[in-house]
Protein backbone atom coordinates (compact mmCIF):
# COMPACT_ATOMS: atom_id res chain seq x y z
CA UNK A 1 0.00 0.00 0.00
CA UNK A 2 1.55 3.33 -1.01
CA UNK A 3 0.90 6.71 0.60
CA UNK A 4 2.24 10.23 0.14
CA UNK A 5 5.58 10.90 1.88
CA UNK A 6 5.36 12.58 5.27
CA UNK A 7 6.14 16.30 5.32
CA UNK A 8 5.89 16.70 9.13
CA UNK A 9 7.42 13.77 11.00
CA UNK A 10 8.03 15.67 14.27
CA UNK A 11 5.58 13.50 16.23
CA UNK A 12 7.10 10.22 15.00
CA UNK A 13 10.62 11.48 15.69
CA UNK A 14 9.63 12.31 19.26
CA UNK A 15 8.04 8.84 19.64
CA UNK A 16 11.41 7.37 18.65
CA UNK A 17 13.25 9.62 21.16
CA UNK A 18 14.92 11.56 18.34
CA UNK A 19 15.66 15.29 18.59
CA UNK A 20 13.04 17.66 17.11
CA UNK A 21 12.95 21.39 16.33
CA UNK A 22 10.02 21.86 18.74
CA UNK A 23 7.77 19.77 20.99
CA UNK A 24 5.06 18.10 18.87
CA UNK A 25 1.46 18.38 20.02
CA UNK A 26 -1.85 16.65 19.46
CA UNK A 27 -4.90 16.39 21.74
CA UNK A 28 -6.89 13.43 22.95
CA UNK A 29 -10.39 13.76 21.47
CA UNK A 30 -9.16 16.58 19.20
CA UNK A 31 -11.93 15.74 16.72
CA UNK A 32 -15.03 16.33 18.81
CA UNK A 33 -17.93 18.30 20.16
CA UNK A 34 -15.98 21.44 21.11
CA UNK A 35 -15.74 22.17 17.36
CA UNK A 36 -18.86 23.66 15.71
CA UNK A 37 -17.92 21.99 12.42
CA UNK A 38 -17.94 18.60 14.17
CA UNK A 39 -21.44 19.25 15.49
CA UNK A 40 -22.60 20.14 11.98
CA UNK A 41 -21.19 16.90 10.54
CA UNK A 42 -22.66 14.84 13.36
CA UNK A 43 -26.07 16.41 12.72
CA UNK A 44 -25.80 15.31 9.07
CA UNK A 45 -24.78 11.80 10.15
CA UNK A 46 -27.78 11.57 12.51
CA UNK A 47 -25.97 9.79 15.37
CA UNK A 48 -22.54 9.06 16.79
CA UNK A 49 -22.46 5.58 15.26
CA UNK A 50 -23.72 7.03 11.98
CA UNK A 51 -20.64 9.23 12.09
CA UNK A 52 -18.16 6.56 13.19
CA UNK A 53 -19.31 3.87 10.73
CA UNK A 54 -19.37 6.13 7.65
CA UNK A 55 -15.92 6.35 6.05
CA UNK A 56 -16.51 9.79 4.52
CA UNK A 57 -17.83 11.32 7.74
CA UNK A 58 -15.07 9.71 9.85
CA UNK A 59 -12.47 11.10 7.45
CA UNK A 60 -14.05 14.55 7.48
CA UNK A 61 -14.18 14.88 11.27
CA UNK A 62 -10.66 13.45 11.76
CA UNK A 63 -9.29 16.24 9.57
CA UNK A 64 -11.38 19.08 11.06
CA UNK A 65 -9.02 19.99 13.95
CA UNK A 66 -6.07 20.02 11.52
CA UNK A 67 -7.82 22.59 9.34
CA UNK A 68 -8.14 24.81 12.42
CA UNK A 69 -4.90 24.21 14.34
CA UNK A 70 -1.32 23.29 13.25
CA UNK A 71 -1.36 19.98 15.15
CA UNK A 72 1.42 17.45 14.64
CA UNK A 73 -0.66 14.26 14.39
CA UNK A 74 -4.16 13.12 13.48
CA UNK A 75 -5.98 10.42 15.44
CA UNK A 76 -8.57 8.14 13.91
CA UNK A 77 -12.13 9.18 14.72
CA UNK A 78 -13.76 6.13 16.27
CA UNK A 79 -14.70 4.76 19.69
CA UNK A 80 -12.94 2.30 22.00
CA UNK A 81 -16.14 0.25 22.27
CA UNK A 82 -16.23 -0.87 18.62
CA UNK A 83 -14.43 -4.10 19.62
CA UNK A 84 -17.00 -5.36 22.18
CA UNK A 85 -19.72 -4.23 19.75
CA UNK A 86 -18.20 -6.56 17.14
CA UNK A 87 -18.33 -9.33 19.79
CA UNK A 88 -22.13 -8.99 19.64
CA UNK A 89 -22.78 -6.95 22.80
CA UNK A 90 -24.96 -4.37 20.99
CA UNK A 91 -23.44 -0.91 21.43
CA UNK A 92 -25.70 2.13 21.37
CA UNK A 93 -25.34 5.81 22.25
CA UNK A 94 -28.38 7.42 23.88
CA UNK A 95 -28.40 11.22 23.56
CA UNK A 96 -26.81 12.73 26.66
CA UNK A 97 -26.26 9.32 28.30
CA UNK A 98 -23.09 7.98 26.75
CA UNK A 99 -22.49 4.43 25.52
CA UNK A 100 -24.31 1.35 26.72
CA UNK A 101 -24.42 -2.33 25.77
CA UNK A 102 -27.60 -4.34 25.22
CA UNK A 103 -25.84 -7.48 26.53
CA UNK A 104 -23.52 -7.60 29.54
CA UNK A 105 -20.84 -10.11 30.55
CA UNK A 106 -21.29 -11.00 34.22
CA UNK A 107 -21.46 -14.79 34.49
CA UNK A 108 -19.99 -18.02 33.19
CA UNK A 109 -22.53 -18.39 30.38
CA UNK A 110 -21.87 -14.89 29.03
CA UNK A 111 -18.10 -15.39 29.22
CA UNK A 112 -18.41 -18.72 27.39
CA UNK A 113 -20.02 -16.89 24.46
CA UNK A 114 -17.14 -14.43 24.10
CA UNK A 115 -14.65 -14.84 21.27
CA UNK A 116 -12.23 -12.72 19.28
CA UNK A 117 -14.54 -11.07 16.72
CA UNK A 118 -14.27 -11.47 12.96
CA UNK A 119 -12.30 -8.35 12.01
CA UNK A 120 -14.46 -7.99 8.90
CA UNK A 121 -17.18 -6.70 11.23
CA UNK A 122 -14.86 -3.74 11.85
CA UNK A 123 -14.05 -3.18 8.19
CA UNK A 124 -15.57 0.31 8.42
CA UNK A 125 -12.78 1.26 10.87
CA UNK A 126 -9.98 -0.01 8.65
CA UNK A 127 -11.50 1.58 5.54
CA UNK A 128 -11.62 4.87 7.48
CA UNK A 129 -7.93 4.51 8.43
CA UNK A 130 -6.92 4.14 4.78
CA UNK A 131 -9.24 6.96 3.70
CA UNK A 132 -7.88 9.33 6.37
CA UNK A 133 -4.26 8.45 5.59
CA UNK A 134 -4.87 9.27 1.91
CA UNK A 135 -6.75 12.49 2.76
CA UNK A 136 -3.89 13.61 5.02
CA UNK A 137 -1.63 13.38 1.97
CA UNK A 138 1.50 13.25 4.13
CA UNK A 139 0.62 16.35 6.17
CA UNK A 140 1.04 14.65 9.57
CA UNK A 141 1.08 11.04 10.82
CA UNK A 142 -2.12 9.12 11.64
CA UNK A 143 -2.57 7.45 15.03
CA UNK A 144 -4.79 4.37 15.39
CA UNK A 145 -6.08 3.28 18.78
CA UNK A 146 -8.00 0.86 20.96
CA UNK A 147 -9.19 0.61 24.52
CA UNK A 148 -7.10 -1.62 26.79
CA UNK A 149 -8.34 -5.12 27.69
CA UNK A 150 -9.18 -3.95 31.24
CA UNK A 151 -10.97 -0.77 30.16
CA UNK A 152 -13.06 -2.71 27.63
CA UNK A 153 -13.90 -5.26 30.35
CA UNK A 154 -15.17 -2.45 32.60
CA UNK A 155 -17.76 -1.47 30.00
CA UNK A 156 -18.58 -5.09 29.08
CA UNK A 157 -19.34 -6.04 32.69
CA UNK A 158 -20.94 -2.78 33.83
CA UNK A 159 -22.88 -2.37 30.56
CA UNK A 160 -22.08 1.36 30.55
CA UNK A 161 -19.81 3.89 32.28
CA UNK A 162 -19.62 3.66 36.07
CA UNK A 163 -18.86 5.82 39.08
CA UNK A 164 -17.72 3.03 41.39
CA UNK A 165 -16.96 0.00 39.12
CA UNK A 166 -18.81 -2.13 41.64
CA UNK A 167 -19.93 -4.83 39.18
CA UNK A 168 -16.62 -5.32 37.40
CA UNK A 169 -14.63 -5.27 40.64
CA UNK A 170 -17.10 -7.70 42.28
CA UNK A 171 -16.55 -10.13 39.41
CA UNK A 172 -12.78 -9.60 39.54
CA UNK A 173 -12.55 -10.38 43.27
CA UNK A 174 -15.21 -13.12 43.40
CA UNK A 175 -14.33 -14.91 40.15
CA UNK A 176 -10.83 -13.93 39.05
CA UNK A 177 -10.83 -16.96 36.72
CA UNK A 178 -13.73 -15.47 34.72
CA UNK A 179 -12.11 -12.04 34.66
CA UNK A 180 -8.88 -13.53 33.33
CA UNK A 181 -10.83 -15.29 30.56
CA UNK A 182 -12.53 -12.04 29.55
CA UNK A 183 -9.21 -10.18 29.59
CA UNK A 184 -7.39 -12.83 27.53
CA UNK A 185 -10.06 -12.65 24.81
CA UNK A 186 -9.99 -8.86 24.96
CA UNK A 187 -6.20 -8.76 24.65
CA UNK A 188 -6.16 -10.99 21.59
CA UNK A 189 -9.03 -8.98 20.08
CA UNK A 190 -7.26 -5.66 20.68
CA UNK A 191 -4.01 -6.95 19.15
CA UNK A 192 -5.86 -8.16 16.03
CA UNK A 193 -7.78 -4.87 15.83
CA UNK A 194 -4.65 -2.71 16.09
CA UNK A 195 -2.78 -4.89 13.61
CA UNK A 196 -5.60 -4.41 11.09
CA UNK A 197 -5.35 -0.63 11.65
CA UNK A 198 -1.58 -0.82 11.09
CA UNK A 199 -2.12 -2.80 7.88
CA UNK A 200 -4.66 -0.17 6.76
CA UNK A 201 -2.17 2.68 7.19
CA UNK A 202 -1.94 3.74 10.86
CA UNK A 203 1.55 5.14 11.55
CA UNK A 204 1.40 4.83 15.36
CA UNK A 205 -1.04 3.05 17.67
CA UNK A 206 -2.24 3.91 21.16
CA UNK A 207 -3.76 1.76 23.90
CA UNK A 208 -6.14 3.75 26.12
CA UNK A 209 -6.25 2.24 29.61
CA UNK A 210 -8.75 4.86 30.72
CA UNK A 211 -9.85 2.94 33.82
CA UNK A 212 -6.59 1.29 34.90
CA UNK A 213 -6.28 3.87 37.65
CA UNK A 214 -9.39 2.63 39.49
CA UNK A 215 -7.58 -0.59 40.44
CA UNK A 216 -5.74 -1.31 43.67
CA UNK A 217 -1.99 -1.79 43.62
CA UNK A 218 -1.42 -5.44 42.78
CA UNK A 219 -4.75 -5.69 40.98
CA UNK A 220 -3.50 -3.18 38.40
CA UNK A 221 -0.47 -5.31 37.61
CA UNK A 222 -2.50 -8.54 37.44
CA UNK A 223 -5.66 -7.43 35.65
CA UNK A 224 -4.60 -4.44 33.56
CA UNK A 225 -0.86 -4.27 32.95
CA UNK A 226 -0.40 -7.99 32.26
CA UNK A 227 -2.98 -7.85 29.47
CA UNK A 228 -1.64 -4.61 28.01
CA UNK A 229 1.69 -6.48 27.79
CA UNK A 230 -0.09 -9.30 25.96
CA UNK A 231 -1.48 -6.81 23.43
CA UNK A 232 1.94 -5.21 22.86
CA UNK A 233 3.57 -8.62 22.37
CA UNK A 234 1.11 -9.37 19.56
CA UNK A 235 1.51 -6.14 17.59
CA UNK A 236 3.08 -5.81 14.16
CA UNK A 237 6.15 -3.60 14.30
CA UNK A 238 6.06 -2.51 10.65
CA UNK A 239 3.39 -0.41 8.95
CA UNK A 240 1.81 -0.58 5.51
CA UNK A 241 4.57 1.67 4.16
CA UNK A 242 7.42 -0.40 5.63
CA UNK A 243 8.13 2.08 8.45
CA UNK A 244 8.24 1.14 12.14
CA UNK A 245 5.03 1.84 14.08
CA UNK A 246 5.50 3.43 17.54
CA UNK A 247 3.23 2.17 20.33
CA UNK A 248 1.78 4.46 23.00
CA UNK A 249 0.25 3.31 26.30
CA UNK A 250 -1.86 5.71 28.35
CA UNK A 251 -3.15 4.73 31.80
CA UNK A 252 -5.31 7.38 33.43
CA UNK A 253 -4.27 7.50 37.08
CA UNK A 254 -1.25 5.34 36.31
CA UNK A 255 1.53 7.71 37.33
CA UNK A 256 2.14 5.79 40.56
CA UNK A 257 2.96 2.66 38.52
CA UNK A 258 5.62 4.17 36.27
CA UNK A 259 8.30 1.84 37.73
CA UNK A 260 6.10 -1.11 36.67
CA UNK A 261 5.65 0.36 33.18
CA UNK A 262 9.31 1.19 32.65
CA UNK A 263 9.96 -2.09 30.83
CA UNK A 264 6.74 -2.21 28.78
CA UNK A 265 7.41 -3.11 25.15
CA UNK A 266 6.28 0.27 23.84
CA UNK A 267 7.92 3.52 22.77
CA UNK A 268 5.73 6.12 24.51
CA UNK A 269 3.99 6.38 27.89
CA UNK A 270 1.08 8.80 28.23
CA UNK A 271 0.56 10.62 31.53
CA UNK A 272 -2.50 12.26 33.06
CA UNK A 273 -2.37 15.66 34.77
CA UNK A 274 -1.66 14.19 38.22
CA UNK A 275 1.80 13.00 37.17
CA UNK A 276 4.95 15.09 37.53
CA UNK A 277 6.77 15.17 34.18
CA UNK A 278 10.24 15.67 35.67
CA UNK A 279 9.75 12.72 38.02
CA UNK A 280 8.36 10.59 35.18
CA UNK A 281 11.35 11.52 33.02
CA UNK A 282 13.71 10.48 35.81
CA UNK A 283 11.97 7.09 36.17
CA UNK A 284 11.32 6.08 32.54
CA UNK A 285 12.75 8.77 30.22
CA UNK A 286 16.23 7.27 30.04
CA UNK A 287 19.52 8.99 29.29
CA UNK A 288 20.98 10.38 26.07
CA UNK A 289 22.16 7.43 23.98
CA UNK A 290 20.45 4.87 26.23
CA UNK A 291 17.05 3.14 26.29
CA UNK A 292 13.96 4.87 27.64
CA UNK A 293 10.40 5.94 26.95
CA UNK A 294 9.17 9.10 25.28
CA UNK A 295 6.56 10.84 27.47
CA UNK A 296 3.21 12.19 26.30
CA UNK A 297 1.01 14.65 28.19
CA UNK A 298 -0.08 16.07 30.44
CA UNK A 299 -1.80 19.44 30.93
CA UNK A 300 -5.10 19.38 32.86
CA UNK A 301 -7.86 19.63 30.19
CA UNK A 302 -9.71 22.09 32.46
CA UNK A 303 -6.88 24.60 32.06
CA UNK A 304 -8.48 25.30 28.67
CA UNK A 305 -11.41 27.04 30.40
CA UNK A 306 -9.08 29.73 31.76
CA UNK A 307 -8.36 32.91 29.73
CA UNK A 308 -5.87 32.39 26.85
CA UNK A 309 -3.01 34.09 28.71
CA UNK A 310 -3.47 31.65 31.63
CA UNK A 311 -3.62 28.73 29.17
CA UNK A 312 -0.30 29.92 27.73
CA UNK A 313 1.21 30.25 31.20
CA UNK A 314 0.20 26.69 32.15
CA UNK A 315 1.44 25.30 28.82
CA UNK A 316 4.84 26.88 29.41
CA UNK A 317 4.88 25.38 32.93
CA UNK A 318 4.28 21.87 31.53
CA UNK A 319 7.05 22.29 28.95
CA UNK A 320 9.41 23.65 31.60
CA UNK A 321 8.59 20.81 34.00
CA UNK A 322 9.80 18.23 31.47
CA UNK A 323 13.22 19.86 31.60
CA UNK A 324 15.84 20.55 28.95
CA UNK A 325 14.80 19.19 25.54
CA UNK A 326 16.94 16.56 23.80
CA UNK A 327 18.77 18.33 20.94
CA UNK A 328 21.57 15.97 19.85
CA UNK A 329 20.56 14.68 16.42
CA UNK A 330 23.31 12.06 16.39
CA UNK A 331 21.68 9.95 19.13
CA UNK A 332 18.44 9.29 21.01
CA UNK A 333 17.43 10.88 24.31
CA UNK A 334 14.48 11.92 26.50
CA UNK A 335 11.63 13.40 24.42
CA UNK A 336 8.21 14.89 25.13
CA UNK A 337 4.99 14.92 23.10
CA UNK A 338 2.61 17.59 24.41
CA UNK A 339 -0.97 16.49 25.03
CA UNK A 340 -3.78 16.85 27.53
CA UNK A 341 -3.92 14.64 30.61
CA UNK A 342 -7.23 13.24 29.30
CA UNK A 343 -9.72 13.97 26.52
CA UNK A 344 -10.72 17.55 25.72
CA UNK A 345 -14.06 18.69 27.15
CA UNK A 346 -16.92 19.37 24.73
CA UNK A 347 -17.33 22.80 26.35
CA UNK A 348 -13.77 23.99 25.55
CA UNK A 349 -13.57 27.29 23.61
CA UNK A 350 -11.69 26.57 20.33
CA UNK A 351 -9.81 29.89 20.58
CA UNK A 352 -8.26 28.66 23.85
CA UNK A 353 -7.01 25.58 22.01
CA UNK A 354 -5.43 27.90 19.44
CA UNK A 355 -3.59 29.70 22.27
CA UNK A 356 -2.35 26.36 23.62
CA UNK A 357 -1.03 25.16 20.26
CA UNK A 358 0.71 28.45 19.49
CA UNK A 359 2.35 28.58 22.93
CA UNK A 360 3.57 24.98 22.86
CA UNK A 361 5.19 25.43 19.46
CA UNK A 362 6.75 28.84 20.18
CA UNK A 363 7.94 28.18 23.75
CA UNK A 364 9.36 24.74 22.91
CA UNK A 365 11.33 26.29 20.02
CA UNK A 366 12.65 28.95 22.40
CA UNK A 367 13.73 26.28 24.91
CA UNK A 368 15.87 24.68 22.21
CA UNK A 369 17.69 27.97 21.57
CA UNK A 370 18.88 28.31 25.16
Curated annotation (Swiss-Prot):
PROSITE patterns per record: UROD_1, UROD_2
InterPro entries for the chain: UROD/MetE-like_sf, Uroporphyrinogen_deCO2ase_HemE, Uroporphyrinogen_deCOase
Pfam families registered for this protein in UniProt: URO-D (PF01208)
A biological process from GO: protoporphyrinogen IX biosynthetic process from glutamate
Compartment list: Cytoplasm
Tagged with keyword Cytoplasm: yes
GO terms under cellular component: cytosol
Keywords, ordered alphabetically: Cytoplasm, Decarboxylase, Lyase, Porphyrin biosynthesis
Binding sites annotated in the UniProt record for substrate: 29-33, 79, 155, 210, 342
Pathway the protein takes part in: Porphyrin-containing compound metabolism; protoporphyrin-IX biosynthesis; coproporphyrinogen-III from 5-aminolevulinate: step 4/4
GO MF entry, a single one: uroporphyrinogen decarboxylase activity
Main localisation: cytoplasm
Record function comment: Catalyzes the decarboxylation of four acetate groups of uroporphyrinogen-III to yield coproporphyrinogen-III.
Quaternary assembly: Homodimer.
Homology family: Belongs to the uroporphyrinogen decarboxylase family.
Annotated protein name in UniProt: Uroporphyrinogen decarboxylase
Gene (UniProt): hemE
Amino acid sequence: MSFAPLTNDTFLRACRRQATDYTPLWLMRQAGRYLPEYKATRARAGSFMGLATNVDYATEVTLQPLERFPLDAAILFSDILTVPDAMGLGLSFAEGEGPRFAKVVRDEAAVAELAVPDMDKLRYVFDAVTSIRRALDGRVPLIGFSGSPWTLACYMVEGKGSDDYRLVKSLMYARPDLMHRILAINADSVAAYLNAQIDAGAQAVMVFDSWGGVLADGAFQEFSLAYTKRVLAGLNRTGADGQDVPRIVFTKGGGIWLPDMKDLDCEVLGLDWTANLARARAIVGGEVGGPGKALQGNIDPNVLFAPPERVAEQARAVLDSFGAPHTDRTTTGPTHIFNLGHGISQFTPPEHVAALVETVHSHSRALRQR
